[in-house]
Amino acid sequence: MNSKSSSLDVNKGAGEAKGNAKTQEKQGAKELKRNYVIDQNTEVLGQGAFGKVFKTYNKHNKELQVAIKVLSKSKLKDHLEAIKDEVDILTKLDHPNIVKYYETYIDERYIYLVMEYIGGGELFDKIAQSENQTFTEEDSQIYMRKLFSACNHMHAQGVVHRDIKPENIMMTQEGELKLIDFGLS
């Protein structure tokens, strides 16, 4: 992710594509299914008021697992600008402790945001599972340094995350932190 700029037009329908190669909006579900495996067996990672998040992989690079946020335009109505803002923010950010944004697909009914899959779960769950055990002071310092580094990067890009909490910090399977949720979930 180098010098990316977003030109997301959430109000358009299928058949209209625009944007640069990295942030290009593509023609909805058909194009999405050409590049990613999406079917009735696709794992649902989560569900919110505006849609669902699915875990899948790229058909051309099966090792590239992704999370696809599928958002209903009809449920979003008054929040379409927030989606545009989230994409604009994610295209600015390139940091090892911030979720990576790959691309957007849009059709008449849905907006599909393709992002990095983070397989280790929420920091909140890691804290809750530890019951009487807490993170060591050394581990806590390492995690806080990484979180501060991500915040410093965001601030340098003019971005302020207004909802940093354990539920919005994911852990990779290798134990790395990734800050998520820059708009609507």
Q: What residue spans do the PLM features occupy?
A:
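Conserved N-lobe beta3->alphaC-helix segment of eukaryotic protein kinase catalytic domains
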Residues: 65, 70-93
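AlphaC helix of the protein kinase catalytic domain
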Residues: 124-135
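Conserved short submotifs of the Hanks-type protein kinase catalytic core
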Residues: 109-122, 126
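Activation segment signature within eukaryotic-like protein kinase domains
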Residues: 143-144
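Protein kinase catalytic-loop region centered on the HRD/HxD motif
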Residues: 149-159
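Activation-segment/catalytic-loop signature of the eukaryotic protein kinase fold
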Residues: 104
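Protein kinase glycine-rich loop
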Residues: 42-49, 53
